[in-house]
């Protein structure tokens, strides 16, 4: 639904409609979405939806798989007799993790509206901070945004930096520099950051070979403020001059 590296939000209702026309089961990864607001599961055009608690303030190691009633049968194991979780799986529940996830769900504010081609997120301080960042860098030729600005997760920023010679700066240098200055950012998705291979997503959006290891990902939260964005922008300029 929301791409983790470049923040792109997919037209899930349109995709879901096409899948239904072709009698295709549609599983949707909503991991990046739920922290930005609640939405109507009943109206969402998919068969399965997976969510991860740590993405909306809950504990790691617990998640949710929502299934539409008509689609649930496909998950049932026909060869083994299971008695728990609607005959889908066995296992002892991690009650502390479930309780933590439940409390985090109660803290999610705002409502997401879903249309055929767009997902409309509630206007809040996080979205305003993201727009403020993009506004401040729009004339800086040393910052190259990756992904769409308009069809993007409201808490997501991704870019690569070019030095004074307009050469891409390796992401690990920026991540380490920011870490030394008490700012936590990422150089890629958790799924692929340890593989050492360039991201297929970045390849597919047309980044050059020397840019594939330079993408930076920043996730904003409710505790962030404008002065922190300003400080981050100052450190970005130091990186441009330094590396």
Where are these regions (language model features)?
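Pyridoxal 5′-phosphate
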Residues: 1-243
């Amino acid at each position: 639904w929301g791409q983790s590296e470049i923040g792109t939000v997919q037209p899930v209702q349109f995709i879901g409609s096409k899948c239904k026309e072709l009698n295709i089961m549609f599983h949707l990864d909503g991991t990046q979405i739920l922290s930005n607001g609640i939405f109507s599961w009943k109206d969402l055009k998919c068969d399965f939806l997976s969510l991860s608690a740590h993405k909306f303030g809950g504990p790691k190691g617990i998640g949710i798989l929502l299934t539409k009633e008509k689609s649930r049968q496909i998950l049932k194991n026909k060869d083994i007799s299971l008695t728990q979780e609607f005959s889908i799986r066995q296992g002892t529940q991690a009650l502390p993790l479930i309780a933590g996830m439940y409390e985090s769900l109660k803290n999610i504010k705002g409502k997401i509206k879903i249309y055929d081609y767009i997902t409309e997120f509630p206007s809040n301080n996080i979205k305003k901070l993201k727009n403020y960042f993009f506004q401040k860098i729009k004339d800086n030729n040393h910052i190259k945004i990756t992904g769409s600005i308009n069809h993007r997760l409201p808490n997501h920023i991704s870019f690569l930096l070019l030095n004074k010679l307009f050469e891409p700066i390796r992401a690990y240098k920026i991540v380490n520099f920011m870490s030394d200055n008490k700012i936590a950012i990422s150089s890629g998705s958790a799924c692929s950051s340890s593989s050492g291979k360039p991201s297929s997503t970045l390849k597919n959006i047309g980044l050059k070979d020397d840019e594939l290891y330079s993408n930076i990902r920043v996730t904003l939260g409710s505790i962030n403020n404008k002065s922190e964005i300003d400080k981050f922008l100052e450190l970005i300029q130091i990186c441009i001059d330094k590396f």
